[in-house]
Swiss-Prot record:
InterPro entries: FMuLV_rcpt-bd, TLV/ENV_coat_polyprotein. The record marks 445-446, 625-626 as: Cleavage. Residues 1-34 form the signal peptide. This is Envelope glycoprotein. The surface protein (SU) attaches the virus to the host cell by binding to its receptor. This interaction triggers the refolding of the transmembrane protein (TM) and is thought to activate its fusogenic potential by unmasking its fusion peptide. Fusion occurs at the host cell plasma membrane. Residues 476-525, 535-571 form a coiled coil. The 17 amino acids long immunosuppressive region is present in many retroviral envelope proteins. Synthetic peptides derived from this relatively conserved sequence inhibit immune function in vitro and in vivo. Residues 448-468 are annotated as: Fusion peptide. Keywords: Cleavage on pair of basic residues, Coiled coil, Disulfide bond, Fusion of virus membrane with host cell membrane, Fusion of virus membrane with host membrane, Glycoprotein, Host cell membrane, Host membrane, Host-virus interaction, Lipoprotein, Membrane, Palmitate, Signal, Transmembrane, Transmembrane helix, Viral attachment to host cell, Viral envelope protein, Viral penetration into host cytoplasm, Virion, Virus entry into host cell. One of its GO terms (cellular component) is viral envelope. It comes from Feline leukemia virus (strain A/Glasgow-1).
Length: 642
């Protein structure tokens, strides 16, 4: 994009901030659905956030797919600005160095000021992709509103009409019906461009909005993020009434954990298949069992959408629930004799505390769970066995089972929902982890996670596990999905064995203890250096080479590369202020005396010479006056005159 010519110098666009600003994450990861269900309907909410105050300026919700849910967003300029146009004070010690604007008459504190904002142009600069900006132009960071130089602006309402071919949004003024400005009278209209509709909204995208005026242009920072949720909220299925009411543990300040001197012994070999009716003499260790869940998730995700596994983090959640169910519509088998899947039914009642979606229901479903049913069957008479398709389970009121008996179902007035079972493995873009480990000031934001269930939900319905596929791709996806199912089956068997050891305890106490055991398993992996501990998740780095086992070394390597790239983009003068936290104060303290001393050395000799010359001239005049007073002037006589 060519830089427009403006009457204002570019130095006016640079403020005296010297700290980098990083924003945490609050949004929902962009969902890449599997091929069988590209038309899945979600509740999509677009949120515009005022970064200065960390408040929500606007939220727009709609029902639609992830391809067409891009509505026109409306927000008021004063919701992005506040009472006064002021920059963010990233460091409280920066206030005394001029980090605030001296003028505050450009805010929205009064009605007159709101009207005044309508007369000033504004321009917007993106901060989500600095590498796509104009070549040879340093657009700065959040402290500059990403507009440190002309040519960085991509949209706005100004006389030079800033445009861009690569930015995600356009921001223009809307029409206001409130001429008195008693309410909101500075409407802005935000629309998504074609590039924005194709972008991966895996986190909040930030922009800087600057008011075009004389002097420094004030800054307002805002983010646009997308939140995706299912239409029906998840509900608990199972006999345990304690788990649905459990809340996540309170977040405490994260302290540095000690690294174990020895790495945990892990079994590098792939998990062997276990017969349904017999248990192998050797059970794989806890570390291998959890890593196999992540490995199977990676293989299934890579087979369905390789673009998602090009560069990502797969995280095991350390808080319950550890599995979630997606209700589906499937063709179950009705048999008079119990199939092999019925023989491997768990001996204990396992509760799935999160079931979402709509699918096939069997039995008398109460009103509290009818939202999970797309199709309901009352059941069959006689001693029939209903076996769930491969890769699916029946989530019943009495627990999780791959097969249900109609005789028991009719006798107990139970009900079941056909579900896909997925481990609670969350998917994150690499930026999510790097921003948490980077040593920079940032706002605290709650992460929004995309679980594998949302990304691969409906996979069995599409025919990968339940149906018969043709071609190499179908066979490959079937193998990868079965490996994930084998890892889940092994993990569920281990959980069931743990419950058997506590069978004399209360059911609720047993499952709570089991959940604490999973939390200890996650800590075990963290102490061994296999995972990057991030809040309440255990993250494993993955790319097209597969799952990386030594994650901490990989994380340190990539953080070092990012730091080198960041340092290379900084100017030599800007880099001084990042070397030490007290360097800014030292420079500002001694810069004044140094400048005065330099001016004295440059202009002192010239001023001194002129002063000496002036004194000499005055002395010469005084000496001449003294000499003339000692003598009398002789009168001249003209002899020709009488």
């Amino acid at each position: 994009m060519e830089s427009p010519t403006h009457p204002k110098p570019s130095k006016d666009k640079t403020l005296s901030w010297n700290l980098a600003f990083l924003v945490g994450i609050l949004f929902t990861i962009d969902i890449g659905m599997a091929n069988p269900s590209p038309h899945q309907i979600y509740n999509v909410t677009w949120v515009i956030t005022n970064v200065q105050t960390n408040t929500q300026a606007n939220a727009t919700s709609m029902l639609g797919t992830l391809t067409d849910a891009y509505p026109t967003l409306h927000v008021d300029l004063c919701d992005l600005v506040g009472d006064t146009w002021e920059p963010i004070v990233l460091n409280p010690t920066n206030v005394k160095h001029g980090a605030r604007y001296s003028s505050s008459k450009y805010g929205c504190k009064t009605t007159d000021r709101k009207k005044q904002q309508q007369t000033y142009p504004f321009y917007v600069c993106p901060g989500h992709a600095p590498s796509l900006g104009p070549k040879g132009t340093h657009c700065g960071g959040a402290q500059d509103g990403f507009c440190a130089a002309w040519g960085c602006e991509t949209t706005g309402e100004a006389w030079w009409k800033p445009t861009s071919s690569w930015d995600y949004i356009t921001v223009k003024r809307g029409s206001s019906q409130d001429n008195s400005c008693e309410g909101k009278c500075n409407p802005l209209v935000l629309q998504f461009t074609q590039k924005g509709r194709q972008a991966s909204w895996d986190g909040p995208k930030m922009w800087g909005l600057r008011l075009y005026r004389t002097g420094y242009d004030p800054i307002a920072l805002f983010t646009v993020s997308r939140q995706v949720s299912t239409i029906t909220p998840p509900q608990a299925m199972g006999p345990n009434l304690v788990l649905p009411d459990q809340k996540p543990p309170s977040r405490q300040s994260q302290t540095g954990s000690k690294v174990a001197t020895q790495r945990p012994q892990t079994n590098e070999s792939a998990p062997r298949s276990v017969a349904p009716t017999t248990m192998g003499p050797k059970r794989i260790g806890t570390g291998d069992r959890l890593i196999n869940l992540v490995q199977g998730t990676y293989l299934a995700l890579n087979a369905t959408d390789p673009n998602k596994t090009k560069d990502c983090w797969l995280c095991l959640v350390s808080r319950p629930p550890y599995y979630e169910g997606i209700a589906i519509l499937g063709n179950y088998s009705n048999q008079t004799n119990p199939p092999p899947s019925c023989l491997s039914t768990p001996q204990h009642k396992l509760t799935i505390s999160e079931v979402s979606g709509q699918g096939m229901c069997i039995g008398t479903v109460p009103k509290t769970h009818q939202a999970l049913c797309n199709k309901t069957q009352q059941g069959h008479t006689g001693a029939h066995y209903l076996a769930a398709p491969n890769g699916t389970y029946w989530a019943c009121n009495t627990g999780l089972t791959p097969c249900i008996s109609m005789a028991v179902l009719n006798w107990t007035s139970d009900f079941c929902v056909l579900i896909e079972l997925w481990p609670r493995v969350t998917y994150h873009q690499p930026e999510y982890v790097y921003t948490h480990f980077a040593k920079a000031v940032r706002f605290r934001r709650e992460p929004i996670s995309l679980t594998v269930a949302l990304m691969l939900g409906g996979l069995t319905v599409g025919g990968i596990a339940a149906g018969v596929g043709t071609g190499t791709k179908a066979l490959l996806e079937t193998a990868q999905f079965r490996q994930l199912q084998m890892a889940m089956h092994t993990d569920i068997q281990a959980l069931e064995e743990s419950i058997s050891a506590l069978e004399k305890s209360l059911t609720s106490l047993s499952e709570v203890v089991l959940q604490n055991r999973r939390g200890l398993d996650i800590l075990f992996l963290q102490e061994g250096g296999l995972c990057a501990a991030l809040k309440e998740e255990c993250c494993f780095y993955a790319d097209h080479t597969g799952l990386v086992r030594d994650n901490m070394a990989k994380l340190r390597e990539r953080l070092k590369q990012r730091q080198q790239l960041f340092d290379s983009q900084q100017g030599w003068f800007e880099g001084w202020f990042n070397k030490s936290p007290w360097f800014t104060t030292l420079i500002s303290s001694i810069m004044g005396p140094l400048l005065i001393l330099l001016l004295i050395l440059l202009f002192g000799p010239c001023i001194l010479n002129r002063l000496v010359q002036f004194v000499k001239d005055r002395i010469s005049v005084v000496q001449a006056l003294i000499l003339t007073q000692q003598y009398q002037q002789i009168k001249q006589y003209d002899p020709d005159r009488p």
